[in-house]
C-alpha cells in the first residue's frame, strides 16, 4: 500500500515517495513533504537546468547549485528555467 503526503509543491494529498531521494535532512524533508508527481516535475526541471547551464555533476559547485534550486523549487519561491530556454513545440 502506498503512502500519501500533503505535497508542499502541489498543495494536496498525493502518493508519497518510496524512499528519501536525497541524503541528509533535505532528503528527509523531501520524503515527508513531496509527492511522486512533484518529484517527477523536479526531475524534468533539473534536466533543463543541467542541459541549459551545461552542468557537470562531478563538479561540487554544480551539485550545490542544483541543491539550492531544488530547495527553491519545493520550499521557496520556485526555480525558474534559464532565460534562454524555450520549451519544445508540442
UniProtKB/Swiss-Prot annotation:
Keywords, sorted A to Z: Iron
Family: Belongs to the Fe(2+)-trafficking protein family.
Molecular function terms, GO-annotated: iron ion binding
SS bond partners: none
Organism whose genome encodes this protein: Nitrosococcus oceani (strain ATCC 19707 / BCRC 17464 / JCM 30415 / NCIMB 11848 / C-107)
Stretches of the chain forming a coiled coil according to its record: none
InterPro entries named among the record's database cross-references: Fe_traffick_prot_YggX, Fe_traffick_prot_YggX_sf
Role played: Could be a mediator in iron transactions between iron acquisition and iron-requiring processes, such as synthesis and/or repair of Fe-S clusters in biosynthetic enzymes.
Transmembrane segments: none
GO CC annotation, single: cytosol
KW Iron (keyword) present: yes
Biological process, per Gene Ontology: cellular response to oxidative stress
Protein name: Probable Fe(2+)-trafficking protein
Keyword Iron part of the UniProt annotation: yes
Domain of life, source organism: Bacteria
Short name of any one Pfam family annotated for the protein: Iron_traffic
Amino acid at each position: 500500500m502506498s503512502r500519501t503526503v500533503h505535497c508542499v509543491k502541489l498543495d494536496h494529498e498525493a502518493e508519497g515517495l518510496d524512499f528519501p531521494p536525497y541524503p541528509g535532512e533535505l532528503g528527509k524533508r523531501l520524503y515527508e513533504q513531496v509527492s511522486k508527481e512533484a518529484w517527477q516535475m523536479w526531475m524534468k526541471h533539473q534536466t533543463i537546468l543541467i542541459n541549459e547551464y551545461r552542468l557537470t555533476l562531478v563538479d561540487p559547485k554544480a551539485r550545490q547549485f542544483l541543491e539550492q534550486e531544488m530547495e527553491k523549487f519545493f520550499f521557496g519561491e520556485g526555480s525558474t528555467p534559464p532565460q534562454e530556454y524555450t520549451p519544445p513545440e508540442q
